[in-house]
């Protein structure tokens, strides 16, 4: 069973979960994919850059077709990048197990006023559509994230 774990960056808080997936499904069966290999401010704070890791797949415009194939062919996809909703929908249409996880949609400050922005409104529409598939699951990263997604319907 092949698992694709997609995050916007490498986060030391999420690596234990990734390691647990590798222990369950096998070292060679789980790929960590990210468009941002390292953030300069994290490296300055002493975090590893992870650039040389063979388990890491760097998503770039030059390999996006290959990445899309990995996305469609994986048995399980866990994704936290909202902009990949079209890729998620294609997987869902073919009955593949797809998880989306996120933090809050409506963080303090602007909050629900974000819904007035056309891009956010479109994302809400897309994720409401995705949530109608029986093989789509939302994993809330915190109580407020669950509240926000529940608010969207």
For the regions a protein language model found, what residue spans apply to each?
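Short, charged, surface-exposed secondary-structure boundary motifs
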Residues: 40-43, 108-115
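Active-site proximal beta-strand in glycosyltransferases
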Residues: 76, 91-111, 139
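Short His-centered aromatic/hydrophobic patch
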Residues: 79-85, 102-103
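Alpha-helix capping/helix-boundary segments
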Residues: 83-84, 144-146
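Glycine-rich, highly charged phosphate/nucleotide-binding loops
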Residues: 49-68, 83-84
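N-terminal subdomain of nucleotide-sugar transferases
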Residues: 1-53, 72-74
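Membrane-proximal helix-turn-helix segments that form the acceptor-binding/catalytic region
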Residues: 106, 117-138, 147, 151-152
């Amino acid at each position: 069973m092949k698992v694709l774990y997609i995050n916007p960056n490498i986060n030391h808080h999420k690596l234990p979960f990734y390691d647990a997936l590798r222990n369950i499904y096998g070292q060679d069966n789980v790929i960590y994919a990210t468009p941002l290999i390292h953030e300069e401010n994290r490296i300055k704070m002493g975090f590893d850059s992870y650039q040389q890791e063979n388990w890491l797949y760097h998503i770039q415009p030059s390999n996006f077709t290959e990445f899309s194939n990995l996305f469609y062919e994986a048995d399980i996809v866990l994704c936290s990048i909202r902009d990949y909703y079209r890729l998620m929908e294609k997987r869902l249409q073919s009955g593949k197990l797809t998880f989306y996880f996120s933090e809050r949609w409506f963080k303090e400050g602007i909050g629900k006023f974000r819904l007035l922005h056309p891009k956010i409104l479109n994302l809400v529409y897309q994720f409401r559509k995705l949530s109608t598939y029986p093989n789509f699951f939302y994993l809330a990263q915190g109580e407020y994230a669950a509240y926000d997604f529940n608010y969207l319907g």
